Amino acid sequence: MTAPPNASPIGPMKVDIKALIAVFLGVALGALDTSIANTALPAISTDLNASAAASVWIVNAYQLAVVAGLFPLAALGDLVGARRVFLWGIAVFTVASLGCALAPDLLWLSLARGVQGLGAAGVMSVNIALIRILYPAARLGRGVGLNAFIVGSSFTLGPSVASLILSVANWPWLFGISVPLGLLALVFGWSTLPNTVPQAHKVDPITAVLSAVCFGTLIYGVGSAAQLSGWPHIVLPLVVAALSGSWLVVRQRGHAVPM
């Protein structure tokens, strides 16, 4: 996914509507899928013969992948260009959505949700960078505000959208509906999103791993505490988060271009 249109300078005079649809649709799908599965957990767990406690991983896997992937993928966007990360992100998200819709058991669904979350992280990590390019400088605040509105409203509407879908279809359609919409965002993005000039610095792989481990274990530990899980599921992840976070801060302080 590297055949781009000509690169555009930051702050074009006109906003490309198809490019905006690609970016905002991708962001909306990523935010929507953060909460869309919550309403359907009882139906999914019954259909897949899974316990209520185990089915929580349908939500957790997605959220962990998003949180763990945001910073490393944003840094990757600086290295290879925001357009490329966005396109690969929406492609992974769309394929994983199909995998979720076809999942025969809880393990498959949870793994597909994790991959879906990584795709969403790719989209969300570079969307502001793309908005900077697509919007004129004088209207950049409007673009950022619209992006925040779409993220917030999509997350809030997730349970309502899920209830609407479940009233006319079964739970796989919660994820299947993202496939055509993801393809639309991919096609529009492929044809309209401009190249960005990659930064000269290199991505530090150790920093990327530390960031993913720190935030992933932090969210896991806090989630386990909220679910009143056993102490090993709470204390150990939080200790790992604290240690990896401390190492991350120390390493970033000496880095020429911190993440």
Where are these regions (language model features)?
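Hydrophobic transmembrane-helix bundles of small-molecule transporters
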Residues: 167-259
